[in-house]
Amino acid sequence: MASVARHLVPEAAEAELCAQIDRTLAAGLRPTHLDAYMAAAMLPGLLAAHVRLGEEYGLWPVLPRSIRWAPGPDAYHAAVAALDAAGRPVADHCRGTLAVEADALAPGWQAVVAALPPGVTHLALHATVPGDFAGIARDHAGWRFREYEWLAGGGLSALCDAAGVRLLGCRAVQALWRTSGPARH
């Protein structure tokens, strides 16, 4: 992240993010949110653009409240506080993909669900349909494919149901984002 921060040209990064969003929309996809691009969007030089693009495109910027590892933590927490003050939806916590072998996947997620703190937790999942991805990222393909199969089989839904955890989904959070902010044109 230090290298990204040193070489970041905020205007160029914002233009690239706009191009990616525009290309996604032009392809007919319906994105719901803007992730933090492996925390790059949390850098102080890009954070305001991340939120602004969320406003402009009606996409919820994923900036969980309890993150302690954000680069530029003061700027990050100020941005989250501003979203809170404006009544915008902010996730409380974040948990992510478990890069584990098949036999550890269900028990791992059972432990994650059992330990969820109170509030809204964003699950950053990286499930991938088995196929060509193995040729792109061989080291990641196995656990991404396993996560896809496990999620498609209802594994996470069953654990959440059993634990009384309500699943919301980013489409619902996007709707809250769009209705809680300034009118878009």
Residue ranges and their predicted role:
Residues 3-29, 33, 45-185:
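Terminal accessory/targeting
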Residues 38-43:
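Active-site pocket-lining segments that scaffold enzyme catalytic pockets across diverse folds
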